[in-house]
């Protein structure tokens, strides 16, 4: 199999780190992104990219095109979560959640698609969540961001089909990644007399299920199979 040029966002931890390493081990040319570090992970070349910043995205895409001449696969994995009651969410919390999880996907696709259309081939894999097919209490804006990714991906798949660009959705359930430890918590909800106790109890259940979830390598294996298939 000819090595593919693959770009994966959020590659410094969790699904992104495992998947980028697995794809690299299979002989692919893998570029990973992180907001903070450009230190390479073995054969995975890391680039500093903020998916909410179009300038940093364009700079990274330009570097890959300059070095490789193409991008065969884009894996939109970067994401974050804020736990709290929908009613008490601040405008900033909502903005951060949607900017990263939804508009980050939009920004990356818009940057890569011109090259895929020109090549008349390409593959975009968007990492959604079980939270993108059902609303999860106290994770409401996370769910909303993933529902948005679902609708966007389904529409995009139809629009770019004539250019031989495939768009795939992956909807993981509970996995033991660093997502649990990195989840932001709404202090307004935690301290609220009506929501607080219910929120903390819900959070305990979610965190227990995540810590007892599957190893992220299982999802990485599924993504590797999607990359390998001509028509996933």
Language-model segments: residues:
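Conserved glycine-rich cofactor-binding loop
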Residues: 12-13
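The beta1-alpha1 cofactor-binding region of Rossmann-like NAD(H)/NADP(H)-dependent oxidoreductases
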Residues: 49-59, 91-92
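A glycine-rich helix->loop->beta "capping" turn
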Residues: 63-76, 82
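Substrate-binding pocket helix/loop in short-chain dehydrogenase/reductase
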Residues: 85-86, 90-95
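Active-site helix of classical SDR
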Residues: 109, 145-148
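Residue(s) in the substrate-gating loop at a strand-loop-helix junction
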Residues: 129
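SDR active-site lid
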Residues: 162-232
């Amino acid at each position: 199999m000819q090595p593919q040029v693959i770009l994966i966002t959020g590659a410094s931890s969790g699904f992104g780190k495992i998947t980028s390493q697995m794809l690299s081990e299979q002989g692919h040319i893998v570029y990973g992104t992180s907001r903070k570090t450009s230190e390479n992970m073995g054969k995975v070349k890391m680039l500093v990219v903020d998916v909410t910043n179009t300038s940093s995205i364009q700079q990274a895409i330009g570097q890959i095109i300059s070095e490789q001449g193409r991008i065969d696969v884009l894996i939109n994995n970067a994401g974050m979560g804020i736990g709290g009651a929908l009613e008490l969410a601040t405008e900033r919390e909502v903005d951060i959640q949607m900017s990263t999880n939804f508009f980050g996907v939009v920004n990356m696709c818009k940057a890569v698609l011109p090259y895929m259309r020109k090549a008349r081939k390409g593959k975009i894999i968007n990492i959604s969540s079980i939270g993108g097919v059902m609303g999860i209490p106290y994770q409401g804006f996370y769910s909303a961001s993933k529902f948005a990714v679902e609708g966007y991906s389904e529409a995009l798949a139809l629009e770019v089909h004539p250019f031989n660009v495939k768009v795939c959705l992956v909807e993981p359930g509970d996995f033991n990644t660093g997502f649990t430890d990195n989840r932001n918590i709404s202090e307004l909800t935690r301290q609220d007399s009506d929501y607080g106790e219910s929120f903390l109890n819900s959070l305990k259940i979610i965190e227990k299920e995540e810590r007892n979830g599957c190893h992220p390598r299982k999802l990485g294996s599924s993504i590797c199979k999607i990359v390998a298939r001509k028509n996933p």
